[in-house]
Amino acid sequence: MVKVYAPASSANMSVGFDVLGAAVTPVDGALLGDVVTVEAAETFSLNNLGRFADKLPSEPRENIVYQCWERFCQELGKQIPVAMTLEKNMPIGSGLGSSACSVVAALMAMNEHCGKPLNDTRLLALMGELEGRISGSIHYDNVAPCFLGGMQLMIEENDIISQQVPGFDEWLWVLAYPGIKVSTAEARAILPAQYRRQDCIAHGRHLAGFIHACYSRQPELAAKLMKDVIAEPYRERLLPGFRQARQAVAEIGAVASGISGSGPTLFALCDKPETAQRVADWLGKNYLQNQEGFVHICQLDTAGARVLEN
C-alpha cells in the first residue's frame, strides 16, 4: 500500500498570474491537503472519504482521481488494477489548489506503486494536463508547488516546467476560506481578453522586482511588490467583503494580501506571529460566510507531496 499526501497551494500570489505559486502548511501541524491511497487489487475501485467527499461528482468517471488512474495506465500502456482511496480534505473551488491536491496525490501514488517508471518532469507534465481538465487550461502554478514544495516560478522552456524561488522564513500566510465556491473557469472568463500597455508594464515590473527581491533577500521590498493588475481588479466582485477585508488586514499589520488562486480564499502575509494571529482572528469573525469556512496560519511547505506510508 502507498499513501501520498499533497499540500494546499496558493497560486498567483498577486504578482505572478499563472506563473507563481506556493505550497503551504499550517503552523499548528494540521494537514491541509488531500491524501490518496493505492493498493494492489484484482479490479479497479475508487473510494471517497473526507470532509468534502460529498462535494465530489457522483459519476465515478468524472472524478479526477479516476481520470488520473486512466491516464497513468495509458502512459504506461497497460491496465494497472488497484484500489484507490481519496481523502478529500480540501474544499472544491476554494482557491487553494484543491484539484491540484487530488491530481498530484493520485499520480504520485500511482507512480510510487509502480516503482517510479516516470521521472518528476514527466509526472509534473501529466499533473498539469489532468488539472487543466478541471480549470479549463493547462497552467502549473498549483500542481508544481503542490508536487515539488516551496515557492515555484513557472518556466516552461528548455524542458524545465518550473524552478524554485527562495522564500522568507519569517513570512506567515494567513489563509481565510469563506466557505463559498468560485469556479476557476468562471473566474477566468471574467478577465479581459486584452490589457492596457501601462498595466502590462506594471505587471512586468512587479514580477521582475519580486523575483529580484526574493533572491537578494529583501522581504520588505518583495511584499511591497505583491500587487495584481491582471486579475484582482476584475475578480474582486466575485468575493463578498474582499475589499473591506484587505483594508482591515493592512491596518492590523499584514505586509501584503490578495486573492489566493482564483478565490474566494484571501491570503494575508504577516512577518510576526502576533500580527498573524490578530489577522486570523479578524478574518475568522468577518470574512467567513458559513460553517464550511476556515482560517489557517501557514508557512511555506518546502517538502511538497510526500509518501506517508509505503
From Swiss-Prot:
**Pathway participation:** Amino-acid biosynthesis; L-threonine biosynthesis; L-threonine from L-aspartate: step 4/5
| GO biological process, any | threonine biosynthetic process
The places in or outside the cell where this protein is found are: Cytoplasm
What stretches pass through the bilayer?
A: none
One of the record's GO cellular component terms: cytoplasm
Does the UniProt entry include the keyword Protease? no
Residues annotated for ATP binding in this entry? 91-101
Does the keyword NAD feature in the UniProt annotation? no
EC?
2.7.1.39
One Gene Ontology MF term:
ATP binding
Question: Keyword annotations for this protein?
Answer: Amino-acid biosynthesis, ATP-binding, Cytoplasm, Kinase, Nucleotide-binding, Threonine biosynthesis, Transferase
Question: Which reactions are catalysed by this chain?
Answer: L-homoserine + ATP = O-phospho-L-homoserine + ADP + H(+)
Q: Which family does it belong to?
A: Belongs to the GHMP kinase family. Homoserine kinase subfamily.
Q: Please explain the role this protein plays, according to its UniProt record.
A: Catalyzes the ATP-dependent phosphorylation of L-homoserine to L-homoserine phosphate.
The name this protein carries in UniProt is Homoserine kinase
Species:
Escherichia coli (strain SMS-3-5 / SECEC)
Lineage summary: Bacteria, Pseudomonadati, Pseudomonadota, Gammaproteobacteria, Enterobacterales
